């Protein structure tokens, strides 16, 4: 069976998908390279919000946490519990990775509904949530793939690849393709849900600009949080699976 060509074709498909565009986009030209300016600008805004919130909340840590410090300690405890549940007792080193994924996606998703991106004019296109662009979701999914490959190899060494011939060598092609389709499912799930939510709100606002869009926006905030949780949970589950063996 042509397993290697098939895997190479799958990776090429992921690269091609990262170039998919919805609507017009604004680029920065740096030499011979085009930089996707919209994604970078909105991602920097999200990162600034996260870093600024953390700095403000813990700039004066107290033995008995109050207000912002208490909130971030609760968030950290939640992420630790999530990581431990999905990865197991060796979850500790992966808490920063899972936490970063969850918080970045969560704030990115909410920024699409809460921040007035549309009022900022660009030469081409318009600003939107970072996760509204498939380049962002594919990048996050590929980072997750690299993480679970690293987790498996660091735990088991080259014996990690034995999982591809279990329970029978006949399943080798399917087991290989499974690892390359995980990024596809993660990226499309997140991208599709966030894009659909923003499109629904835009359509309703254009049709009934006053009352009707408000409940839909609240529903969008709820589903955006759920999508961040699903992505982080699946990322942790994939890492745990690579460390424990193929199920």
UniProtKB/Swiss-Prot annotation:
The keyword Transferase does not apply. Pfam families: ATP-synt_A. The chain crosses the membrane at residues 38-58, 95-115, 134-154, 199-219, 220-240. It is a multi-pass membrane protein. One of its GO terms (molecular function) is proton-transporting ATP synthase activity, rotational mechanism. F-type ATPases have 2 components, CF(1) - the catalytic core - and CF(0) - the membrane proton channel. CF(1) has five subunits: alpha(3), beta(3), gamma(1), delta(1), epsilon(1). CF(0) has four main subunits: a, b, b' and c. It comes from the Eukaryota. It is found in: Plastid, Chloroplast thylakoid membrane. GO terms for cellular component: chloroplast thylakoid membrane; plasma membrane; proton-transporting ATP synthase complex. The keyword Kinase does not apply. This is ATP synthase subunit a, chloroplastic. Belongs to the ATPase A chain family. HAMAP family: ATP_synth_a_bact. NCBIfam families: ATP_synt_6_or_A (TIGR01131). Keywords: ATP synthesis, CF(0), Chloroplast, Hydrogen ion transport, Ion transport, Membrane, Plastid, Thylakoid, Transmembrane, Transmembrane helix, Transport. Key component of the proton channel; it plays a direct role in the translocation of protons across the membrane.
